[in-house]
A protein has these predicted regions:
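Short acidic capping loops at alpha-helix termini that bridge into adjacent secondary structure
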Residues: 86-90, 111-113, 189, 196, ...
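Active-site pre-lysine segment of PLP-dependent enzymes
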Residues: 147-157, 169-192, 196-229, 245
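PLP-dependent aminotransferase class I/II
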Residues: 47-49, 219-297, 301-304
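PLP-dependent enzyme catalytic core of the Aspartate aminotransferase-like
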Residues: 177, 325-329, 334, 338-369
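Conserved PLP-binding catalytic core of the aspartate aminotransferase-like
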Residues: 285-286, 295-329, 345
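N-terminal small-domain helix-loop-helix segment of the aminotransferase-like
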Residues: 2-97, 102, 369
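PLP-dependent aminotransferase-like
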Residues: 106-163
Length: 369
């Protein structure tokens, strides 16, 4: 038989699909628990800012019958006002994942390549692979992106370099001097995506602001999201900012109307009054980091706790085995084998009650070995 499915490209056929976790209710039934503490997806346990909550509560359900703005008009104008740029420099997508896909579709063709780290946000590599684009994966150095090695990997055919800053899952980051040096050495030979999904968690004055960096480097694109600090992961709103020319090119590959109306409303409202929310979230994360550090030190466990609302813990047993032990206690963490960190787990940093529950479950899970 010579059907159409036999002509599927090998790079699609060979790609292993992502399998998401089951809904919370199904997981609770599976593991026999009455509650589930989610510490697996770097979500903001404080939820959205009050302004976003109020906007969603005031939403008229009758508007669900009407298509949203096809290009997130109001949100793009709010972003432009916040960052002092043109609304046309912003492209809003159904989460950063859609924006990643749009960038790769617009800038790469089969036979081209991207460069990124080997242990970073996996979606860059995934989208490239199932699009027939090669991924040149550069090993981390001391758990951080290696600028010299990444620069060396940018040879003929490389169109995009993805720099996750801070890096997920290690929390490491390039300061302004390192980033500027990298961009000067690259000299515009490829587009550089600064994925700043966790930028709002960082208050170090030496952290480079991509929105400023791009003003002097036309080949820089900046990604940010409302999923993390702003607590709107369920609405799926991410965005890109670039030069007018670059954003116009990328917009041609983006599906219109992909961002739902509630997401647009909530994100626009969140921007309008976010200072208190950001400060409260940073305090919560700082307290959780200190708590986790004390617990790991007491247990003699290696841990990595950089910038962002997450930490990694090295475990003396298989991360998948530990995951099941955690789940039987109603605690959900992220196994890290898929990030090329076998026998590590990643833990979202959350309020005290959740961290206490994690610590209790951790001790119980380790005692079971």
């Amino acid at each position: 038989m010579n059907g159409p499915l036999e002509r599927i490209p090998a790079y699609v056929r060979e790609f292993e699909r992502y399998v998401p976790s089951r809904p919370d209710a199904a997981l609770m039934r599976q593991y026999g628990v009455s509650r589930l503490v989610r510490l697996n997806n770097n979500e903001n346990a404080l939820g959205p800012p009050p302004s976003a909550r109020e906007a969603v509560a005031a939403f008229d359900p009758a508007r669900a019958a009407v298509y949203p703005s096809g290009d997130a008009y109001d949100l793009r104008h709010a972003l432009a006002a916040r960052f002092g740029k043109s609304p046309e420099q912003f492209l809003v997508g159904n989460g950063s994942c859609e924006v990643i896909a749009s960038v790769i579709r617009a800038l790469c063709a089969p036979g081209d390549a991207i460069v990124t780290a080997d242990r970073t946000f996996a979606v860059y590599e995934w989208v490239a692979r199932f699009s027939g684009i090669a991924s040149r994966l550069v090993p981390l150095k001391n758990l951080a992106l290696d600028p010299a090695a990444m620069h060396a990997a940018v040879t003929e055919g490389v169109r995009v370099v993805f720099v996750c800053n801070p890096n997920n899952p290690t929390g490491s980051w390039w300061n302004r001097a390192v980033l500027e040096s990298f961009l000067r050495a690259l000299d515009g030979r490829a587009m550089v995506v600064l994925d700043e999904a966790y930028r709002e968690f960082v208050d170090d004055p030496d952290f480079p602001d991509g929105m400023e960096i791009m003003e002097s480097h036309d080949n820089v694109l900046v990604f940010r999201t409302f999923s993390k600090m702003y607590g709107l992961a369920g609405f799926r709103v991410g965005y890109l900012c670039g030069s007018l020319e670059a954003t116009d090119i990328i917009r041609r590959t983006q599906i219109a109307y992909s961002v739902n109306v509630l997401g647009q409303v909530a994100a626009t409202a969140a921007l309008a009054d976010d200072a208190g929310h950001i400060a409260a979230t940073r305090r919560m994360v700082a307290d959780a980091k200190a708590f986790l550090g004390r617990e790991c030190d007491a247990l003699g466990l290696e841990y990595v706790c950089g910038q962002g609302n997450f930490a990694m813990v090295r475990t003396p047993v298989s991360d998948t085995l530990l995951y099941r032990r955690f789940m039987r206690q109603g605690i959900m963490v992220r196994t890290m084998t898929g990030f090329r960190f076998p026998n590590w787990i990643r833990v979202s940093l959350a309020p005290e009650a959740a961290m206490q529950a994690f610590a209790t479950a951790l001790r119980s899970a380790l005692d079971a070995k």
